[in-house]
């Protein structure tokens, strides 16, 4: 059966509300109405995100689960500490609900109690697309109360749905900020299918739609890779050629009609390339597809972990949020469905991820290093030759020590002193344009990181230790393309 190469759309509604309620059934009905309203507005699956405190949190959890939403729990404290805020009956109800949660995460295990509640509330806002609140309109009675969470949501521009505790009226704030559709994920999903060959390996049997999705965004990135470095280098080379044409005309007293046209052709070509660089939108699309492909490659390589390792937990990139969320939720739901023995995981991960990436970085290092050596050597040779020609000209003008043939004099004293510094400047600029120093250092660093990870995995004896190494490795592998994403998302290329 052929898998569809698209990923599902997951919306998250965060929740905050009071513990003590005068009309709990009425509040429950208002919560139900608000969730139904959101589900009508946003296609795809909805996930509820909240704590599990008595009162409003419990009502929200029951209503979300009753409507078929998954429930993700963010506890401000470890369960043993969190339990102290409940009566026996309240905790019995909370335990029953926690058993139905798809995910339970303790956000903070070290802070003071009120600080922990505030941090958990802020994290709920951060992880949500829209925040649903049950609020009496009054200031918070302690740090981390509902009013504090609402204030934070307002400050960061998160859309709010507020249920008034007294009147049960539902009102909205900043509603236009809620994106029912994610254009980036829709763009990825709309890409045509890729040829069956190519793409990432799937050693742990991840869902077919993720593999198909990875192949098509990887195919798009590979076919649409922009040639911006080559274009920038071509502007430099065209300017150098224009300078050499002008220098030749002056040095050799050439007055051929073709020379001004040659220089004009070079300068017009450089201008055309510069304009092309400003108009080129392929760079941003390429980076988006490349980043999406690498996120999926990382997910496929780590699918065999028995627990839901939060590899992407700290990443919140513009345009990638729903893609990362889809991968995280799908991984979480399948974690442990097909258990993989530890030694099998180590062998497959090393073979299909570590060794594959190590070979890639070694290959790229082998390509970049000769370019760096050649350009650096060319710069020094051109610079030293320019100094030699200029010094010879200066000495000749002072002492006139020998008669020099006219042809040699034109080359040695006029053409080369002008052209060689320009060529040296072009060669050193090509090193920067091609980012060779950083790339060589990056490739060497990644080879060292991967070799160290290989050894750590070989000696790993527990899943916890393996998860730590895998998380560090995957984040290091993603760092390069994340940097490119930042450049193209927040800076204009000139």
Predicted regions located by residue number:
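Acidic/glycine-enriched connector segments
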Residues: 1-172
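Conserved non-transmembrane functional hotspots
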Residues: 171, 176-494
